[in-house]
Design a protein with these regions (language model features):
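Short, conserved micro-motifs composed of acidic
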Residues: 34, 90-91, 101, 108, ...
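Single-residue signature of alpha-solenoid repeat helices
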Residues: 40, 79-80, 115
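Flexible helix-coil transition and linker loops at the boundaries of alpha-helical arrays
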Residues: 48-60, 87-95
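Periplasmic OmpA-like peptidoglycan-binding domain that tethers envelope proteins to the cell wall
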Residues: 376, 380-383, 585-685
Length: 685
């Protein structure tokens, strides 16, 4: 063959190949523009392999980026690899947005350090971008947030999930918490039909989603799951081929909401017309004779090309929250609201920057208490869609400011967490998540909030630690609680407390002084047990006060002594009808005159401190005994110092016969400050 002819043949082939790739890219771009991301991704993938890394670097980078975008928008984990391919082709020189989206994908996968770097690169060019700022901030806080934990408990609702299918957006049918619907792409036969849903979605590549329903039986178990009756007729009618008829195998249905009586359902619906996906709409269906009636489109905008979905009604049914990419929002998918006027929904408006971001806010839900719940990938979170709750700031009347809370690590984590619903006014319900799913299948989880339990428990003893089995407790609370009961035989007690209450507890026992404790259960976020052991001082004998110290030969109180005396202040306040003798004692060193004078001054210093802190002077008698009343050893002291016999008086004769080290111990024991009750009828008569 002539070499010239061969050259021109090869050149023609190359030209035809190039033209073919260009046409395929244009076709993929069109599919991307109408939201058929899965189909577009396949086309971009085939084009990428046909382009040269040198000659077609820019175009190859564009194709890889668009492929990554397709995967990102349908939460396909292959997005990260596509973005890496685009970066190798220097696509960032064309559009730095790749750093933002790559950061989102990496965060979605739990690769927080890499995500933070990607966000930083994007912020270099766009320092004021909220989504990038939120993403970077979240990546730095993940470990801290995980440690905070959450009171909510979750578990997979296995009865609703099916292997290799997605199941999401559970919703109770109005106030009936024994009936539930959810979206699923499982391949079930319609009731009374023979066909299965086979046609995959051009958007996600998964089978089409339909609305399924289930109910609880008398035993409280969820019964067999079946297609929502009346919304599916198993095939495509002639009318549905050319109209927006909601019945038929090509239609896709999803997130729904109900009026409180369960008779009206609003749901998300999407159906291709003439082979083209025109986006989602919201439809209404009324229930009669056990089946859902012919759905009718809910008009929210004059422009019929605007996509709307994810309806959520408030408790009164006069406000509709929904999701749209309509002009006037913050970008991406935003949450909007409209008001009911007769049969029409009017005054559609976005919720504003407190809720919406340039990313996506979806799956709104309004709790019975008025709290708004939704999913977002634009606010600080764990990656992908996170669940948030929002309440209006009540600082100002009619405020439009929202206070936002991330639902925490029980709900949120790597992947998407979304589509929450509650059982009436409780904090129990269901939500959707693809956590731990490598292929991204959504599952339904149940959640519940355990009741917070507050307990007061402890032991009532004498000052030596012996249980007082005949002690009594009186509990008074700011909520009206006023209870009196005996401790157990072993001196212990235990009782439940209420939330947001201030408590006072008084312990009494014959022959002993009272003891009082105060505490509260205000602003607690988790269960708590208060352990309060009370030691009651005897009335009949002196009580040694520990940790009362003075400088050598001085009577001024040290800081440690003042702290100990504050306990005596409290005891006198808890027992307002007693008077006491407060006595100070010295060791055997020094003259009698010196020790008597020193001990009297020390006793007076203690009384002066008590008077300074509000104790009446008439209730106090300071006495300095010097060294005239040495300690007599009891069983408790003998247990600590076995070499001191029980009933032994630590007098000068006994001490001088001991070795020097033991003499010093005895001197320390004799150096003490005590009090004893003199009267128990102060101001009673």
């Amino acid at each position: 063959m002539n070499w010239h002819k061969l050259f021109y043949i090869l050149l023609a082939i190359l030209c035809l190949t190039g033209c073919s790739v260009q046409r395929k890219i244009k076709r993929a771009d069109k599919k991307f523009a109408i939201g058929e991301y899965y189909t577009a991704a396949d086309i971009y993938k085939s084009c990428y392999g046909q382009l040269s890394a040198k000659k077609d670097r820019e175009l190859k980078g564009y194709v890889a980026y668009r492929q990554g975008e397709c995967y990102r928008l349908i939460n396909n984990p292959r997005a990260a690899n596509a973005y890496q391919s685009a970066l190798r082709c220097k696509y960032q020189l064309q559009d730095s947005t790749i750093f933002l989206h790559a950061g989102q994908v990496l965060q979605y996968q739990g690769k927080y350090k890499d995500a933070a770097k990607s966000y930083e690169l994007y912020l270099e060019a766009h320092p004021d971008n909220y989504v990038a700022q939120a993403g970077k901030y979240a990546c730095s806080k993940i470990d801290e947030w995980k440690k905070e934990g959450s009171r909510y408990k979750i578990s997979e609702a296995k009865e609703f999930n099916q292997r290799r299918t997605s199941n999401f957006a559970p919703m109770f049918i109005g106030d009936n918490t024994d009936a539930l619907v959810f979206a699923s792409n499982r391949q079930e036969k319609p009731k009374g039909g023979s066909k299965k849903l086979q046609r995959p979605s051009n958007v996600t590549g998964q089978q089409l989603f339909q609305i399924y329903q289930t109910r609880k039986n008398a035993a409280g178990e969820w019964e067999e799951i079946e297609l929502a009756e009346g919304l599916y007729d198993g095939g495509e009618s002639e009318q549905s081929k050319d109209s927006a008829d909601t019945k038929g195998g090509t239609a896709e249905m999803g997130v729904c909401t109900f009026t409180r009586d369960g008779r009206t359902m609003l749901f998300t619906y999407s159906k291709p017309i003439n082979g083209q996906d025109l986006g989602a709409k919201i439809y209404r269906s009324d229930r009669a004779s056990g089946e859902w009636g012919e759905p009718q489109e809910v008009k929210l905008f004059l422009d019929s090309s605007i996509t709307v979905g994810h309806p959520a009604l408030n408790v009164t049914g006069d406000t509709l929250y929904f999701v749209s990419d309509a002009p006037g929002g913050e970008g991406g998918k935003d949450i909007w609201m409209a008001e009911l006027d007769g049969e029409n929904w009017l005054n559609a408006q976005p919720l504003g920057k407190g809720i919406n971001t340039a990313a996506d806010e979806m799956y709104p839900y309004v709790h019975a208490d008025g709290t708004l719940y939704f999913a977002s990938n634009g606010h600080p979170g764990y990656g992908g869609l996170d669940l948030y709750k929002a309440t209006r700031d009540t600082t100002f009347k009619d405020s439009t400011v929202w206070v936002l809370y991330n639902m925490g690590p029980s709900f949120n984590g790597v992947g998407d967490d979304f589509g929450i619903t509650f059982e009436g006014e409780t904090q129990n319900g269901f939500f959707s998540s693809n956590k731990g799913e490598k292929k991204g299948y959504d599952k339904i989880y149940r959640f519940w909030l355990p009741e917070m339990e507050f307990i007061a428990e402890g032991l009532v003893t004498d000052e030596q630690g012996n249980p007082l089995s005949d002690a009594q407790l009186r509990i008074v609370g700011s909520d009206g609680t006023n209870s009196k009961f005996n401790v157990r035989r072993d001196g212990t007690y235990k009782f439940k407390l209420n939330r947001e209450v201030k408590y006072v507890m008084l312990a009494t026992c014959r022959g002993h002084l009272n003891a009082k404790e105060q505490w509260n259960t205000l602003n607690l976020k988790d269960s708590k047990t208060y352990t309060m052991n009370l030691a009651l001082s005897p009335i009949s004998r002196p009580v040694k006060m520990e940790n009362i110290f003075y400088e050598f030969g001085r009577w001024e109180l040290t800081q440690a002594s003042e702290t100990e005396l504050l306990h005596l202040v409290k005891l006198l306040e808890d027992n307002p009808n007693i008077t006491i003798e407060l006595s100070a004692h010295t060791d055997m060193k020094g003259t009698d005159e010196f020790n008597n004078d020193l001990s009297q001054k020390r006793a007076q210093s203690c009384c002066d401190f008590l008077i300074k802190h509000g104790i009446e002077r008439e209730r106090l008698t300071p006495v300095g005994y010097g060294k005239t009343k040495p300690v007599i050893c009891d069983k408790a002291l003998n247990k600590k110092y076995p070499w001191i016999p029980v009933e032994q008086e630590l007098n000068e004769v006994f001490i001088t016969a001991l070795p020097d080290d033991k003499q010093e111990i005895c001197n320390q024991i004799n150096r003490r400050t005590e009090f004893k009750v003199v009267k128990t009828t102060y101001k009673l008569y």
